[in-house]
Amino acid sequence: MQGHMILGDNDIQEYEHSISTIASLGVKAFFSELDLSVLPNPYNFSGANISDNFAYRAELDPYKSGLPKRQETAAEQFWIDFYKLLLRHQKDILRVGFWCLHDGCSWRNDFPIHGRTDYATLFDRQGQPKPVVKKIIQLVK
């Protein structure tokens, strides 16, 4: 399953249903390309067709100077809930992979609108773990 997620557009229960369905077929789920965009979703856009492109508008790039605590907290909660899901179904999951190492190199900064600033990974622009990483590690212990 490809994991380009958008905060507010993805439901953990849908992922749970997908994992269970795949497991019922006797195979293991494989998550690839995990990231979580916190930016507004233009035109209710979904998918990753590289030819898709929307015009830049400032209201679609509200976090250029930093992520507000409200959005950071919402993203943290999504990641925690997602990892709880992965742990609940670990026997049914073969692998989990990420799309990028840190926010500075994330494709989400330029897709589908070039020049936006997103915070889609678990590591900041300097490659340092975000606070949620410690919380995820505690879940796994």
Language-model-derived ranges and their functions:
Residues 1-5, 31-36, 98-100:
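A cross-domain feature marking catalytic cores of carbohydrate-active enzymes
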